[in-house]
């Protein structure tokens, strides 16, 4: 989001960024709309009602007031779930003012009655109408089931012709075309990374002659495949290979065998680059995903990738790794013994290409190209 904003500013196109959670604003073109208390209250409301996206009245009024001052030609939405915005109020403002909208889907939440992903429970109710949700206890967690109400409210609220949907992979675009968004324009713009940052380095991170099997996640939930790393570790030749997991918190660490090296989440990008560059292979056993940039980061550091055939994860691999079926962690053993890949990174997946594609889309949608 900020990468696109910065490039628009460099091209002398008026651009403003509004977000709900995270750091504070740095200038007059940035606006943080929520605080910890309002997010907590919205989250608590969701827990007891299963109506995420239908609170945050005050915060959303502030956004609308800000938007009225900006008078945008295009509004580019990203994740509008996360306990910080009222989707009904937002889209009423958009429709009343007939504002062009680009909306990047980062998961499946916009067209389901509750969940962000549904692969692990193999649920396709979202194609017709959600009800009796099997994932009420997953984000956004609730103790009641209002999935049918949510589904129909979203279907009504998001019904807008002046909306272009962007997905970061072909997999998600195909799902969108089967949802109640099927009549909207859908574009695929792949996520990209900064190749000036993520590149191979000789600074080896690990002092071992063993070959490193690396896993990286910001949060090691069940859908990220942590259990499969533990299963793989049990059948691994420990004289030859070493599993290393990055992003492990203290609570999760207690359930991981000592034979696996764990590293807490790092905000030092240079350290992460050294870790990627030191790995023999990057293993991504994800069970639910959109288009994981960890694959891109690993390949940019010349590390081949093994991933499950999940979501858009295989779309970036090309000849730089292997795609195996979900749960087939045993196949990793066979691949380790025969892998001989010289990674050639595809520049389709660069930050520069991603930004260029978004700006071209803006200009196509809005020929004036004044305020975005």
Where are these regions (language model features)?
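Short hydrophobic beta-strand element within catalytic cores of glycosyltransferases
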Residues: 304-307
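Conserved acidic donor-binding segment of nucleotide-sugar-dependent glycosyltransferases
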Residues: 322-329, 336-339
């Amino acid at each position: 989001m900020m990468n696109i904003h910065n490039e628009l500013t460099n091209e002398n196109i008026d651009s403003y960024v509004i977000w709900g959670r995270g750091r504070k604003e740095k200038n007059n073109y940035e606006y943080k709309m929520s605080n910890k208390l309002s997010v907590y209250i919205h989250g608590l409301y969701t827990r007891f009602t299963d109506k995420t996206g239908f609170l945050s009245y005050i915060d959303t009024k502030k956004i609308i007031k800000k938007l009225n001052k900006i008078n945008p030609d295009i509004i580019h939405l990203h994740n509008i779930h996360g306990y910080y915005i009222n989707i009904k109020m937002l889209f009423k403002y958009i429709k009343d003012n007939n504002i062009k909208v680009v909306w990047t889907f980062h998961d499946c939440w916009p067209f389901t009655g509750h969940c962000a992903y549904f692969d692990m429970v193999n649920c396709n109710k979202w194609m017709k109408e959600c009800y009796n949700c099997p994932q009420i206890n997953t984000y956004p967690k609730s103790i009641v089931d209002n999935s049918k109400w949510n589904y129909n409210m979203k279907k009504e609220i998001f019904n807008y012709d002046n909306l272009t949907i962007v997905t970061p992979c072909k997999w998600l675009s195909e799902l969108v075309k089967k949802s109640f968004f099927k009549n909207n324009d859908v574009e695929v713009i792949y996520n990209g990374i900064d190749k000036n940052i993520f590149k191979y380095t000789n600074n080896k991170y690990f002092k071992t002659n063993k070959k490193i099997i690396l896993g990286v996640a910001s949060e090691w939930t069940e859908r990220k495949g942590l259990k499969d790393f533990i299963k793989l570790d049990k059948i691994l030749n420990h004289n030859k290979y070493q599993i290393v997991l990055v992003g492990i918190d203290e609570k999760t660490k207690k359930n991981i065998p000592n034979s696996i090296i764990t590293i807490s989440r790092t905000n030092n990008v240079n350290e992460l680059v050294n870790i990627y560059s030191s790995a023999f292979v990057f293993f991504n056993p994800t069970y639910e995903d959109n288009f994981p940039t960890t694959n891109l980061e690993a390949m940019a550091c010349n590390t081949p990738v093994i991933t499950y055939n999940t979501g858009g994860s295989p779309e970036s691999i090309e000849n730089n790794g292997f795609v195996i079926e979900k749960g087939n962690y045993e196949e990793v053993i066979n691949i380790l013994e025969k892998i001989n890949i010289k990674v050639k990174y595809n520049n389709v997946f660069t930050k520069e290409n991603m930004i260029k594609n978004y700006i071209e889309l803006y200009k196509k949608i809005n020929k004036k190209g004044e305020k975005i």
